């Protein structure tokens, strides 16, 4: 069942009052104060087209992009070491996030570390096979000498 708001592409404060809907006292939603198109009307289109249609501006008529730059200075930022860049990627907040499963040990790892993970597994297998083949060759040599 869809609500009345989801079927109406735009809903302003006047439209809400015209339908008999009551606004809460002193706590009206920001979208009721100005006409904003519903994102559902822009399904399958880029967000930029919705932003252009909505003409979103801050209350002091500063664009949202500029406000974001100013507000970004006060945000807390966690810095990552350059040595860990192969683990987290260049821009972790913007990079796509994928996980892969190692078929040898069923461990879930990020693709960035999968090669080193397999390298460690291969190295441990090689060391085991080298020591086994070394012992086997010693036994073969001893049998030939007898």
UniProtKB/Swiss-Prot annotation:
PANTHER family: ATAXIN 7 RELATED (PTHR15117), ATAXIN-7-LIKE PROTEIN 1 (PTHR15117:SF9). It comes from the Eukaryota. It comes from Mus musculus (Mouse). Residues 1-27, 125-146 are annotated as: Disordered. Residues 127-138 have a biased composition (Polar residues). Coiled coil: none annotated. This is Ataxin-7-like protein 1. InterPro entries: Ataxin-7-like_regulator.
């Amino acid at each position: 069942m869809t609500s009345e708001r989801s079927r109406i592409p735009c809903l302003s404060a006047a439209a809400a009052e015209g339908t008999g809907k009551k606004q809460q006292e002193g706590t009206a939603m920001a979208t009721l104060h100005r006409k904003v198109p519903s994102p559902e009307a822009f399904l399958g289109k880029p967000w930029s087209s919705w932003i252009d249609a909505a003409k979103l501006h801050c209350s002091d008529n500063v664009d949202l992009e500029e406000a974001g730059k100013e507000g970004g200075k006060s945000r807390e930022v966690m810095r990552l070491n350059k040595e860990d860049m192969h683990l987290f990627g260049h821009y972790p907040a913007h990079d796509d996030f994928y996980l892969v499963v190692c078929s040898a040990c069923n461990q879930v790892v990020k693709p960035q570390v999968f090669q080193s993970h397999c390298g460690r597994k291969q190295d441990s297998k090689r060391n085991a096979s080298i020591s086994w083949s070394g012992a086997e060759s010693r036994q073969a040599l001893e049998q030939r000498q007898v």
